[in-house]
Curated annotation (Swiss-Prot):
This is PITH domain-containing protein 1. InterPro entries: Galactose-bd-like_sf, PITH1-like, PITH_dom, PITH_dom_sf. It comes from Xenopus laevis. Gene3D superfamilies: PITH domain. One of its GO terms (biological process) is positive regulation of megakaryocyte differentiation.
């Protein structure tokens, strides 16, 4: 049962899809997260931010959660093991003011800090209190069609000093990253004038020898 808490600003569009066996498959993107490299800034207990990304069938496990430390904000840096087309997001919290009121998404900005959250988000949602995962917030799919890294900024809650989250579900499609594309990107990032000079004189050297 969803509650009628709403928050001004941003998009508050949500849907209530049917809860069948296929729902667990739809929310399987947690398997494509590089959990060892996932970061959650301002978590009160180290490593607890990772625990909220889990199987749909385990979404109501209240023993696993993340709680903010100094204030109400949380920032998740989520690297994927390939490229993701993100279609929707579900968030479960408590039926209290600790529930997040606003969620902001940033794509392909690794290692974000709170200082970086002043930039415009790729999409912002105003959240309603959801204790069972009944509400899905659909993303702008065209904007999130090629995501290798996702940052989730919980910017505010409904008035409590700290924020508490039990579950975050990500729905979408995953494709394996092509190794040769990564190699090309790495080369271009490391390119310098010396590299180009070497390539220019190499044919001449081969000709002389």
């Amino acid at each position: 049962m969803s509650h009628g808490h709403s928050h001004g600003g941003g998009c508050s569009c949500e849907s209530e899809p049917s809860d069948g066996p296929e729902r667990g498959l739809e929310y399987g993107l947690f398997r494509k997260i590089d959990l060892d490299k996932l970061q959650c800034l301002n978590e009160s207990r180290e490593g607890s931010g990772r625990s909220v990304f889990r199987a749909w069938e385990e979404r109501n496990d209240r023993t696993r959660f993340v709680e903010s430390d100094d204030d109400e904000e949380l920032l998740f840096n989520i690297p994927f093991t390939g490229n993701v087309k993100l279609k929707g997001i579900v968030l479960i919290g408590e039926d209290s003011d600790t529930h997040p009121a606003e969620l902001r998404l940033f794509k392909n900005v690794p290692h974000m800090s709170f200082d970086d959250t002043g930039r415009e988000a790729d999409q912002t949602f105003s959240l309603n209190i959801d204790v069972n995962g009944n509400l899905e917030y659909p993303t702008k799919i065209a904007r999130f069609s090629n995501v290798s890294h996702l940052s989730i900024h919980i910017s505010k809650n409904f008035g409590a000093e700290n924020t508490k989250i039990y579950y975050i579900g990500l729905r979408g499609e995953w494709t394996e990253a092509h190794r040769h594309e990564v190699t090309i990107c790495n080369y271009e990032a490391a390119a310098n004038p010396a590299d180009h000079k070497v390539s220019q004189i190499t044919p001449q050297t081969n000709f002389i020898s």
